[in-house]
Amino acid sequence: MKSPPWPKGKKLVHLDLKGAPPRLEYLLKLIELFSKLGVNGLLVEYEDMFPYDGDLKLLQATAQPPYSREEVLSMQEFAKSKGMEVIPLVQTFGHMEFVLKHRPMWSLREMAPCVSTLNPHRKEGVRLVMEMLRQVVELHPGLNALHIGADEVRIGVLSDSYGGLRHHFFTYSLYHPLRCTCLARGEESKLWLASPGRTVEQLFLSHVTKVAQAIKEAWPDMTIIMWDDMMRGMSQDTLKASGLVGLVQPMLWDYTPNLDVDTTVSLLEKYCRAGMSDLWAASSFKGSTSVHTCVPSTQRHVDNHVQWLKVAAALSAAVNLQGIAITGWQRYDHLSVLCELMHVGLPSLAACLQTLSLGEFSPEAQSKVAETLGISSVEAEAMGRTTEDESLFPGRRLAELTVELNSLLNSEDIRFFENNMYVRGWFSSYHQQRKMVSPLIAMQIQSQASAYLTALQEKVEALREEMVLLYPESTAQEWIVEHVSPVLAPLQRITEDITACVNEMVPSNILPAHNQTASFE
C-alpha cells in the first residue's frame, strides 16, 4: 500500500568513519552520488578519524592516519557545494570506546570493565567531552547542528525469549529494550542513587543535560540532536522535568524491517507532549542485520523505510519532523568487526531514498534505481552491470568482487569442507593421530582443498587490489582477516596435515608436487 512521500525536511546520509574510512577521493565521489540521489545532509561520525590535537591527540586512529584538517575542510566544502548540510556526530556518554580504551582515560569509565560508558559524576568527563566538541566545532566553520549521541549507555543483555545474542544492540525493537548493566553500576553511581528519590533515569538525564547546557553556553544558536533510545521507557513527566526540553531534538532510531508503526508513533507523540516537538527519525540502509554481515539485503532496508513512511503519515500536526537520518554502520561499535561497507551498500541506499521520495518501492522505482546506478538488479547479491560507466556507481567493481567472494566463502562445499563424506570417512582426527590413511583418497581430498584455496586466493587478491584504492590498506587487511581467514584456515590445515600423513606412507620421490597455499593473516 502506497504512503505519502516523506514530508519536507532533511534527508541525511550517515557516514560512519570508525570503520573503513573512505579515502578522500572516494568520499567525494560518494557525496556526488548522494547529491544525485536527493540527499541534502550528512551525519558524519568521525570517531578516531578526526584530527584531534593537543591532549586529545591520543584519540587519533593508529591503524591508519586520521583525516587531515585539510581533508575535513575539503569534504565539508564539497558537500556544501552540493547543497548538503554537514552535522558531526560526537558521542558524549555511551559508545565512547575509542576514548575510554586509552589508559590515560581509564579513570573516566563508569566501571572498569565497561569501556563504552563515561562516568557521569566526574567533572573531568564533561571537560573531556566539551574539548572534543570544541575541536570538532572549530573545524566545521558555520556549523548549525551537532549530534551528541548518548545511545546505548550500557552493556546490553538480551533475554532468552528474545533470541539470545543472535540479535545485537542495533536490531532490538521498541518492544525489547536491553537491560542496563553498566550505567549506575559504578561505585560513585551507587552512592548517588542511595539518596532517596534518585533514579537511573535521572542519572542519565542529568549528564546529558549538563552537556547540552554547556554546548548552549558555548554556542547559543547550536541545534543539538541526540539518540532517543535511553528515553523510551521514561514517562512524559520525567522528560518534562529533565531540563532537556528546549535543549535537544531527539532522533528516534529503528532499523528493523517490521518496525511497529503504532508503537513508534506513540513514542514520538510522547516526546512531543513532553515539550520536545522538534523530532527526527533514523532508518538504516546497511549495517543493522548482523554484526558480521558482508552484503546487505536491499529489500530488508526498503521494508524499514516503508514502515517509516507509515509512521510519518500517522503523526499529528504537532510533531515537527525535522528529517530522517539514513544510517549505514560500518561497525556495530568501535571494538566489533567490520560489517557491510559503503561500496556494497549503495544499491540499498539508492532504493531506500527512492522509496522515501515516491512513498513506495514500485517496479518503476526499482527500474529507476537500476538505471541510475547502471545495474540490472537493486539487490547487491544479484546485481549485474548494464553499462561500463563506472561514474554511475563509485566502487562498483569492489562491490562485485565483495559479492562474488562472499558467495564463495558461504558455499557449503567450502565452508563445511571438513564435514564432507570423504574427509569424515578417510581423514578423521583418528586417522590424523595415527598417521594411517588411504594415500590415494587423502591426496584427492588435498587436491580438492587446494583447488578451493586457489580460487579463494585469486578472488581475495583481486579484492585487495581494488579495496586499497578506496580504503586504507589496514581496512583491506582487517576485512580479509575477519571474513576470509576463518574459512581458509581449515582448508590450509587439511592440506598440510594430509602432506604430513602421506609422507609417512608413500616414498617422497613419487609424491606429486602440490601448490603451496598463501596465508592471508
Question: Where do the PLM segments sit?
Answer:
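Secretory-pathway glycoprotein ectodomains that are cysteine- and/or Ser/Thr/Pro-rich
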Residues: 2-4
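Substrate-binding groove of N-acetylhexosamine-processing glycoside hydrolases
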Residues: 32, 77, 126-134, 138, ...
